[in-house]
Structures are given as C-alpha cells and as structure tokens.
Amino acid sequence: MHPFSFNHIALSVKDVNESIDFYKKVLQLTEIKNTASNSKTRWLSISEGKQLHLIPRPDAEIKTNKAVHFALATASLHTFIKHLEELKVEYSDWLDTPDKDYIRKDGIVQIYFQDPNGYWIEINNDI
C-alpha cells in the first residue's frame, strides 16, 4: 500500500484577484509564493503546509454543485459563522436552509457557502 497525504486544492477561477481577496478576507488564508512556476497561478496557505492554488481561467466554464466541495475544519465554528455574517456572506445547511447549520448523525456541525466562482466550501467542527 502507498500512504498518501493531502497536498493542495487547485481551482480554476475567472478573476484571480477577486478570488484571492475572497479567500484572504473570508477564510483568512495567507498568500504564499508560487514556487512551481512563473505563471499567474496564485497560492494560499491553508495550514500545515497544505495549499489552495487559484488558476486564472477567465474563459473557462465553471460548473458546480454542492456535492462537489472542499471542507475545512475549525474548533471555533460559531465564531466563524459570526465572521461570515459580518461579511454578509450567505451560508446554509446541507439542505439549503439559509443561515442555518447542520448537525450530522455523528454530531459534527457543518455549514456551506460559495466563493465568487460558485465553488462550494464546507466548514465544520470535526477537529
């Protein structure tokens, strides 16, 4: 068996500057140097060496649905929800109930919201 570890998420984005601003403001990620190339792809640090790569594709068609998402965990989910509310970022539970969290069968609490390109992001307290 080959052991794997998570490395990065790469997303095609229409406007890389708008997306960078969103992820820095909403998720409070830090931009880091793109060490792979001199392209216009920009990188953000998620934590523990994990990264989010934003690849500019202004003409790409981006199709999304809630089942295709990435999830981040925080021990302070309710504080994060207040942060979203202050920024007027709409969020919902899995069933699309606005301004509501969802408690899974295993007790984990989660919410969902979208970035400027329509990508779904789950934030939960599974930490």
Question: How would you label these PLM feature ranges?
Answer:
Residues 1, 34, 43-44, 60-62, ...:
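Short secondary-structure boundary/capping segments
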Residues 2, 5-15, 45, 62-127:
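Vicinal oxygen chelate
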Residues 11-51:
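Core segments of cupin and vicinal oxygen chelate
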Residues 52-55, 122-124:
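Conserved beta-strand in the GNAT
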